[in-house]
């Protein structure tokens, strides 16, 4: 997918729309995290894209929904003592998550159709937005496939499908945010002591990998492990990191290994970002914003782990990862523009 270069003629309303859509994705990530952390995701056992807009109203409808839930592994194994009011609470959280997904989808689709009809979008933009539209539709399908994995024989969703669901949200967010940056920031006047984009590509890749392992940590409940993993009683527990067979399966299926990799990548990103700012002396506010956001993200992560994954901290930890990715994407965009403008880099 090629981001439109000819953005001088993008009207203000399109720019505002792209910004709103990007914020909408962040809100979806936040609400999705809350839905997972409150264990609400499996309370709605059917996928009804149209009639699912309407929640149960009468007592009879609520009883019917709970009867469906009572046939799920989650109810049979974990929530067999759940009260009717507790079920309603879980149901409404998941309902709001799905409703918000529909709203965000319409916020993207309806203005897109309007702007296309009014010929406010060039051909390249139209193609880009069609791709995003398809990805949004697929995200809805992916969300249901994730939920479905927890309705068969296990009281929890597949951590692979959970990760795919989050990464697809990241891809959609990236495409919207990148298109917004291309429409709004047409030139850069600052001086940066850097003449290539490699370092920011490396940081972007590491953030994506970190988000991937963060999702695996969530899906495997690795954040609830003992607080000194993988260092117990002053010794390195290699046997805990590599006990699964085949060995490579530890990378994705062993909670201790997944949590350890998540921690190592966090330190690696901190070292690279700090070194980039110190060595290159990037006198550019967004570069310092990147470091500040990273430190906040690390703080959220550490506190989330220490305090047994509280909902507020864990939700903020997840959405801050997307914000960190957005800031780095902004820096990458600025460096690319500087190269295109043939700006002479100075110390």
From Swiss-Prot:
Q: In which pathway does it act?
A: Porphyrin-containing compound metabolism; heme A biosynthesis; heme A from heme O: step 1/1
Q: What is its main location?
A: membrane
Cystine connections: none
Q: Which residues cross the membrane?
A: 14-34, 95-115, 125-145, 166-186, 198-218, 260-280, 289-309, 311-331
The residues that the entry says bind heme are 262, 317
What Pfam families would the database entry show?
COX15-CtaA
**Which reaction(s) does its UniProt entry say it catalyses?**
Fe(II)-heme o + 2 A + H2O = Fe(II)-heme a + 2 AH2
Enzyme category, top tier: oxidoreductase
The record's listing under InterPro entries reads:
COX15/CtaA_fam, HemeA_Synthase_type2
Q: Which UniProt keywords apply?
A: Cell membrane, Heme biosynthesis, Iron, Membrane, Metal-binding, Oxidoreductase, Transmembrane, Transmembrane helix
Instruction: Indicate yes or no for the key word Transmembrane helix.
Output: yes
Localization (cell): Cell membrane
Q: Which GO terms describe its biological process?
A: heme A biosynthetic process
A GO molecular function term, named singly, is: oxidoreductase activity, acting on NAD(P)H, heme protein as acceptor
Q: What EC designation does it have?
A: 1.17.99.9
Q: Which cofactor does it need?
A: heme b
Topology relative to the membrane, per the entry?
Multi-pass membrane protein
Can you cite an annotated GO cellular component? plasma membrane
Q: How does it assemble?
A: Interacts with CtaB.
General function of this protein? Catalyzes the conversion of heme O to heme A by two successive hydroxylations of the methyl group at C8. The first hydroxylation forms heme I, the second hydroxylation results in an unstable dihydroxymethyl group, which spontaneously dehydrates, resulting in the formyl group of heme A.
In the record, the note on similarity to other proteins reads:
Belongs to the COX15/CtaA family. Type 2 subfamily.
Its name, as the record gives it, is Heme A synthase
Look up and give the organism this protein is from: Ehrlichia canis (strain Jake)
The major lineage groups are: Bacteria, Pseudomonadati, Pseudomonadota, Alphaproteobacteria, Rickettsiales
Encoding gene, per UniProt annotation: ctaA
């Amino acid at each position: 997918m090629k981001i439109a270069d000819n953005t001088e003629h993008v009207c203000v309303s399109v720019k505002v729309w792209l910004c709103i859509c990007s914020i909408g994705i962040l809100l979806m990530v936040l609400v999705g995290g809350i839905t997972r952390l409150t264990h609400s995701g499996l309370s709605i056992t059917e996928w009804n894209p149209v009639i699912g807009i309407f929640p149960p109203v009468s007592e009879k409808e609520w009883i019917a929904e709970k009867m469906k839930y009572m046939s799920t592994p989650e109810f049979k194994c974990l929530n067999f003592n759940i009260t009717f009011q507790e079920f309603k609470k879980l149901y409404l959280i998941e309902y709001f998550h799905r409703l918000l997904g529909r709203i965000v989808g319409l916020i993207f689709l309806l203005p897109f159709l309007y702007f296309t009809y009014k010929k406010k979008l060039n051909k390249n933009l139209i193609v880009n937005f069609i791709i995003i539209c398809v990805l949004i539709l697929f995200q809805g399908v992916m969300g249901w496939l994730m939920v479905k994995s927890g309705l068969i024989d296990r009281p929890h969703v597949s951590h692979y499908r959970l990760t795919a669901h989050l990464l697809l949200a990241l891809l959609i967010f990236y495409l919207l945010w990148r298109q917004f940056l291309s429409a709004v920031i047409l030139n850069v006047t600052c001086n940066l002591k850097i003449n290539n984009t490699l370092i920011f590509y490396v940081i972007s890749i590491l953030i994506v990998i970190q988000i991937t392992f963060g999702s695996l940590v969530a899906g495997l409940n690795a954040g609830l492990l003992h607080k000194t993993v993988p260092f117990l009683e002053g010794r390195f527990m290699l046997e805990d990191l590599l006990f699964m067979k085949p060995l490579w399966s530890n990378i994705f299926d062993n909670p201790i290994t997944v949590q350890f990799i998540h921690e190592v990548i966090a330190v690696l990103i901190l070292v690279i970002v700090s070194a980039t700012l110190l060595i290159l002396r990037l006198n550019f506010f967004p570069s310092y914003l990147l470091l500040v956001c990273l430190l906040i993200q690390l703080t959220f992560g550490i506190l989330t782990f220490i305090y047994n994954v509280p909902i507020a901290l864990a939700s903020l930890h997840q959405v801050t990862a997307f914000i960190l990715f957005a800031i780095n994407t902004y820096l990458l965009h600025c460096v690319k523009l500087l190269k295109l403008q043939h700006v002479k880099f100075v110390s």
